[in-house]
Design a protein with these regions (language model features):
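N-terminal intrinsically disordered, low-complexity tails of helicases
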Residues: 1-53, 57
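Conserved P-loop/Walker A NTP-binding site and adjacent catalytic elements of P-loop NTPases
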Residues: 33, 39-226
Length: 226
C-alpha cells in the first residue's frame, strides 16, 4: 500500500483505500460547495484526495459562517479547514472584508503566509504578512484581503489603526491553547474580546491540538466544538 505526501497540508494517500471507496474523495470535497477552481487546486497542487472525518464535520459549519472551535490532534488538517473557509467566504459571503490569521510565533506566521498565498492566488485574493520586521508592511496590510500576524503585532495594529477591526470578517486563532499561557494568553484574550465587542458578526475559528476546559471556551466564543 503506497503512501504519498506532496504538501504539508496533504494527508497521506492510501491508494488502495481511495480506489475502492464507494463515494470517492473528490465527491466529498465537491459536495462542500467549494468553487471548481478550489477543488481542482486541492487535487492537483496539494494532492488532497480525501478529508479526515473531523474536517468533514467541521467544514460545513465553518463555510456556513458559524464560529468554530476545532480541537483535533496535530497533523489532522486543522489549518485546511481555516484556509478553505477563508478562501470561500471572502469571495462569496464577505466581499471587501478581511480575514486575519493569528499565530503565536513569527516562524509559524511565515509558514501560514506561504500556504495561504497558494490558495488565495486561485481565487484572486491578496495576502499580507505582519510580523513587525518587514519594510512596507503597512501598505501591504491595507491592500490585503488576508492578514497573517502574531497576536502581539495585531495588538499593535489595533492600537494604531483602530479602523482595522471594522473590516474583519473572519478571525482565525491558531494554537488557541496558548490562551492559558501566562505570557501570551492575556494578549490573545484581549484581542478576541475586543473583536467580539466591536465586530460581533465576525466569524471566529479557534484551532488547537490540546486545550483544557474546551467546552467552556467554546461557550465563551459562541462556537461549535469539534
Amino acid at each position: 500500500m503506497e503512501l504519498t505526501t506532496r504538501h504539508p497540508l496533504e494527508r497521506p494517500i492510501m491508494r488502495m483505500f481511495v480506489a475502492h471507496s464507494s463515494g470517492g474523495s473528490e465527491k466529498t470535497i465537491q459536495h462542500l460547495g467549494l468553487s471548481p477552481d478550489i477543488v481542482k487546486f486541492l487535487r492537483e497542487k496539494w494532492g488532497i484526495k480525501e478529508l479526515y472525518p473531523p474536517q468533514q464535520e467541521a467544514l460545513p459549519h465553518a463555510l456556513d459562517g458559524k464560529n468554530l472551535m476545532l480541537t483535533i490532534p496535530t497533523a489532522s488538517g486543522k489549518s485546511l479547514v481555516a484556509h478553505l473557509t477563508i478562501a470561500h467566504r471572502l469571495k462569496h459571503d464577505l466581499i471587501n472584508q478581511k480575514a486575519i490569521y493569528v499565530v503565536p510565533l513569527k516562524a509559524l506566521a511565515s509558514e501560514k503566509y506561504d500556504e495561504l498565498k497558494e490558495i488565495a492566488n486561485v481565487v484572486g485574493l491578496k495576502v499580507a504578512l505582519a510580523i513587525g520586521d518587514r519594510s512596507g508592511e503597512i501598505n501591504s496590510i491595507e491592500d490585503s484581503d488576508i492578514l497573517v500576524c502574531t497576536s502581539e503585532r495585531l495588538d499593535s495594529l489595533f492600537r494604531n489603526r483602530s479602523n482595522l477591526i471594522s473590516n474583519i470578517g473572519i478571525i482565525v486563532t491558531d494554537e488557541f491553547h496558548l490562551l492559558h499561557d501566562h505570557s501570551r494568553g492575556p494578549t490573545l484574550e484581549v484581542l478576541i474580546s475586543r473583536i467580539r465587542h466591536k465586530k460581533p458578526d465576525a466569524q471566529i475559528i479557534a484551532l488547537s491540538a490540546t486545550v483544557g476546559n474546551c467546552e467552556d471556551l467554546a461557550k465563551w466564543l459562541g462556537a461549535e466544538l469539534i
